[in-house]
């Protein structure tokens, strides 16, 4: 199975000094609002992604926890990473919405991760909808947010 250029770029850049940081900002740059959370990609491979953000003043709300929208940005980035790393090269994806459950106050360093099976994008027909699960944990390993991101999958147009 052939995967996209984003995964190849990650695999090359992670070996370089500051490569993960540079890759993180390059990936987020394509959806500039993601830059507001200053994400760092921990890992990206077919079936799995992990991305971290630190709590700071710019992403806090009035009760000094990480703002819900910042957490959703983290969720969206983790989903995008695992989708890019896992989807076959002849398909494309588009997020259509997310169902989010806030379980605890989101404070400190947060890590979003997503795991999907190898057969995840093997739909009976295209286009079709899949749900990508994303879990957000704090530095103590406690899940603070859980989300299912609805993703529309279709074949790339022929060139």
Q: Can you describe what each PLM-predicted range is?
A:
Residues 9, 54-79:
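Hot-dog-fold acyl-thioester-processing enzymes
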Residues 50, 97, 146-150:
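Well-ordered beta-strand positions in beta-sheet-rich domains
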Residues 37, 47-49, 94-98, 108-110, ...:
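A generic structural signal for short beta-strands and their flanking turns/coil linkers
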Residues 81-117:
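Hydrophobic beta-strand-centered segment that forms part of the acyl-chain substrate-binding groove
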Residues 69, 73, 77, 97-102, ...:
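Hydrophobic alpha-helical segments of small multi-pass membrane proteins
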Residues 1-52:
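Non-catalytic linker/capping segments at the edges of enzyme domains
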Residues 1-18, 106-107, 117-159:
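HotDog/MaoC-like acyl-thioester-processing domains
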Residues 36-44, 48-54, 60, 66, ...:
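Soluble, non-transmembrane catalytic domains of enzymes that act on hydrophobic metabolites at membranes
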